[in-house]
Design a protein with these regions (language model features):
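Short catalytic/signature loops enriched in Gly
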Residues: 2-3, 17-21, 237-326
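ABC ATPase NBD coupling module
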Residues: 21-24, 78-94, 120, 240-245, ...
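Conserved ABC transporter NBD signature motif
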Residues: 69-77
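Conserved ABC ATPase "signature" region
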Residues: 77, 127-145, 254, 258
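Conserved ABC ATPase signature
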Residues: 150-154, 158
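A short, proline-enriched helix->beta-strand linker immediately N-terminal to the Walker B motif
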Residues: 169-173
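P-loop NTP-binding/switch modules centered on Walker-like glycine-rich loops
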Residues: 176, 180, 184, 188-265
Length: 326
């Protein structure tokens, strides 16, 4: 199966203002990240707040420029595209944002919000555009009268459906969904997740699904990448990640998921706070919180390595992770 997205050694650093004679410092929000997404696949990207996952999503769709590395969408390197070439490429990839209200123009009716990208990219009669917008509203489970309403007239879940319809307007092949259900009540989260799965099949979509909640990611993803302090520390199929985690951070995340059928006495409690990306620890970025860290981890940075079954992990002692309680 062909890759729709290839992310190669992407870095995104932000300069920190320092004194005139001081050495330039950087916040390493994304640090040497590589992965790929196949056509029709959902890649779930999970990690704590501040790990760099949302920044990575913005870099991938060119809302932010990468410091280095390359992003290839449908075989085209979009990393340094500018002007008309960048504008043309944007039809292939769109984003669903975390806060549907903040991402929708309160001064526009829903019909105008969804039709705006179509007007910007396609020369179609107004009647055809309206017909297309009404079709998209139907696809996301909204009635035709939504066309003439404003965003504030809808619930959070309905506003997110409007955002999804807008993302579909140009028929992209790749959608980056940045925490698309985190602002919704639990009762509505599953509805939106099921909608995304239905739309994926209907429109032949691929997703980069970003979330901090592993249980949400499990519901929708084919492959899961676990991110920590700017690095991806593990990649595997959803089943492999949950049944055979090989990174201690992944193991800790899984142990924190509430279990209905058992008491969660084996939860792995990570000590300490997430280090600052402006001052990351030397060696493995996780060693300051890792229950199995050794001296080697304090001095060397583990690289993602293939351990079979399309399972990759960045850990020197992955064979000891199974001994952890959780």
């Amino acid at each position: 199966m062909e890759n729709i997205l290839e992310v190669n050694q992407i870095k995104k650093y932000y300069k920190i203002k320092t004194g005139l004679l001081q050495k330039t410092q950087y916040v390493k929000a994304v640090d040497d990240v590589s992965f790929s997404i196949k056509k029709g696949q959902t890649f779930g990207l999970v990690g704590e707040s501040g790990c760099g996952k949302s920044t990575l999503g913005k870099v991938i769709i060119r809302l932010e420029d990468a410091t280095s590395g390359s992003i290839i969408v449908n075989g085209e390197d979009i990393t340094r595209l500018q002007g008309k070439k960048l504008r043309k490429s944007r039809q292939q990839y769109q984003m669903i944002f975390q806060d549907p209200y903040a991402s929708l123009n309160p001064m526009q009716m829903v019909g105008d919000i969804i039709s705006e990208p179509i007007l910007n990219y396609k020369k179609l009669p107004k009647e055809e555009i309206k017909k297309e917008v009404l079709y998209l509203l139907k696809c996301v489970g909204l009635s035709e009268d939504a066309y003439y309403k404003y965003a504030h007239e809808f619930s959070r879940g309905q506003r997110q459906r409007v955002g999804i319809a807008r993302a579909l307007a140009l028929r992209p092949s790749l959608i980056v969904a940045d925490e698309p259900v985190s602002a919704l009540d639990v009762s509505f989260q599953s509805q939106v997740l099921n909608l995304l799965k239905d739309l994926q099949e209907q429109f032949n979509l691929s997703y980069l699904f970003i979330a901090h909640d592993l249980s949400v990611v499990k519901h929708i993803s084919d492959v899961i990448g676990v991110m920590y302090l700017g690095h991806i520390v593990e990649i595997a199929s959803d089943k492999e990640i949950y049944e055979n985690p090989k990174h201690p951070y992944t193991k800790a995340l899984i142990s924190s998921i509430p279990q209905i059928d058992k008491h969660n006495n084996n939860r792995i409690i990570l000590k300490g706070e997430l280090p600052s990306p402006s001052n990351p620890p030397q060696g493995c970025s996780f060693h300051t919180r890792c229950p199995i860290a050794k001296d080697k981890c304090k001095e060397n940075i583990p690289q993602l390595k293939d351990i079979g079954d399309e399972h990759q992990v960045a850990c020197f002692y992955e064979n000891k992770v199974g001994d952890l309680n959780g």
